[in-house]
């Protein structure tokens, strides 16, 4: 583009000179353009073509230079003067303004400029730009500001600042004036951020930006970066091109932005020009082919019209103007002024035309008068004219009624962009989405909700998935919002229908509806393996302490029964035969020896019968209370036994956030960008603060980019990672196969999901009313049941729990079999021991008897001994043996 301009600059004078150089109708015009002023130069060329007449032609001589370089400006001005130009159009800044005005006054060469107006009287300087001081002061009074910051660019001069300070002294305003004109370009971003942070400390939230477009854009970028573009801030852009800047990026932040506009796009003259301007080729006319034009370019175009009209008036007055013989050295000493320069100056000041900048008229000092400046405010639907300012009427407000926030008229012909995020079950791609188009590709809770909202509000909508896959958080360093919140703040979407949590920091930059779903932060862990029943799981229905007490009670009852049986005379009785005859012995017997007492207590406890029972009242009392005791214990045991044997229990390693914070074996984290992370970062509760300290410093990072990644990490970590997320999502995933996650503990907080719209959006109130209506109709609960439970894959208990809880496995009762086998083995062992013991004892007795027989031989004695042996050791006989 620069090369094209340089070639045009070199060729234009030659071409114009070849065509008109020998013609008396050719009027030489100089041009001093700063580098980078492509659009201004294109507007100048368009004006030259547009306003050329058959009477005369304006022939330009263009120099492209650094206007801040006084030496370059001097050389260019003198070069133009030596070429015999009739007038010079150009730009200046604070460093070159004195040089140019001095040459103009000395040489009587008129200088037409769209640069900032100068103070005082400067002959031969025609200023196309209207003075902004009056309009700015009126706007400050309209907003009733009494304390604000004033950021100015010293390149534009200090006249406006001086007028503001004079009014401040008179009206007792508190003004903080800051010069941003000398800020180093290499460090400008950092310095702008530091500047606004200092203003924040001073509670300065009203700021006037008296700068040109490029510097305003740089400042606005940093204002957005540090989050000072939200509700509560008010900025006035003190130049004449309110729509020239990139307002889209600050449009939805919530801050009030006001300014001034000299080019009225509603004017028919401007509309016709824009029609032609937008058809120009960008390559031939750099900066053209757009539907807008910078105010400096518009003033440049108007300047060509003013010069053309001035020379036309001179022709009508038959005043002959010629530079023949008058082209000389501007540095001559003494300087030789151009004699006819005064006539041209007078003609220029007498011009009165309608241009792109409105009514163009000058006073005797070459300054604009009788002009009108539009007052603008930035709304969510773009810049809006709220009034105008003129020298006669001063501040006039024409916008008396602001559009209602509930007004959705005009949306019928607009497709509302709905931003959302792929998150099950809120928004999911259909299985056959590749065969579908538009909104039909998606399904889920929020998809159904968006359809209901659109039906109630009466608009068409288009679902779009957020590009970065994030919900929305502000970067701690750059202060830039990402995710769905960022798309709303920066105007990429009209509404967000997603599981977006309502938080304070988000509420500062966007608007939320009433919550359509309530929830809280919860803990997700991998479902622990169901514990296999132990060998002695049949003991689980009663605590081990109870079993110990039962054993002691059993022993105690047996001992008491033994004692009362010994002391009670009614337990002693003589032994009787089966036919009723009493024994010949006078000795009484007692059946409740210590072993029989133990046997009786055991039989009663096991609910089995026993051959013996107490005869005495005291013994029966002991037996009765023992039977009552065993009745209650056995009934309680039986009631709990079924549940303990048929239900496989899961033992969770953690049950609450406190459990997580007290250990380091299980890692835990949150979504990397969202309200859950922000909750822990801002929390002052000791447990949550401790958890945040751990999460922030954990290596490897415990934060995940998406919820799906967090769930996958839980499933793959073998119980060594816990994921903190919203309870609704936790409950949904718990109902999805492979059914291996679970929610533990209660919610850590209470919050809600809301539908978000840009600050001040006309959709806000309508969406809010729609949510309330859907809630009253019960549709929100119906949608949740549909996507959470009706489509669940794990059942109420998870997995195949119904089949598993109804059947007993061998492992459940293995201990009983072990006891049975152990008891049988013990019985056999005891029997063997008894046999061996008795055999050994009888062998010894037989040996003693044999020895005695050898000493006293007697057949009768032998017969008696044999009988005794037979009676005591008839192991294999059929007769009963009583030992």
UniProtKB/Swiss-Prot annotation:
SMART domains: Lig_chan-Glu_bd, PBPe. GO terms for cellular component: AMPA glutamate receptor complex; plasma membrane; postsynaptic density membrane. The chain crosses the membrane at residues 544-564, 617-637, 813-833. Residues 565-591, 611-616, 834-883 are cytoplasmic. L-glutamate binds at residues 499, 501, 506, 675-676, 726. It catalyses: Ca(2+)(in) = Ca(2+)(out); Na(+)(in) = Na(+)(out). Phosphorylation at Tyr-876 is required for interaction with IQSEC1 and ARF6 activation, which in turn triggers AMPAR internalization for persistent synaptic depression. Palmitoylated. Depalmitoylated upon L-glutamate stimulation. ZDHHC3/GODZ specifically palmitoylates Cys-610, which leads to Golgi retention and decreased cell surface expression. In contrast, Cys-836 palmitoylation does not affect cell surface expression but regulates stimulation-dependent endocytosis. It is a multi-pass membrane protein. The modification Phosphotyrosine is found at residue 876. It comes from the Eukaryota. Residues 592-607, 608-610 dip into the membrane without crossing it. The M4 transmembrane segment mediates tetramerization and is required for cell surface expression. This is Glutamate receptor 2. It comes from Macaca fascicularis (Crab-eating macaque). The gene is GRIA2.
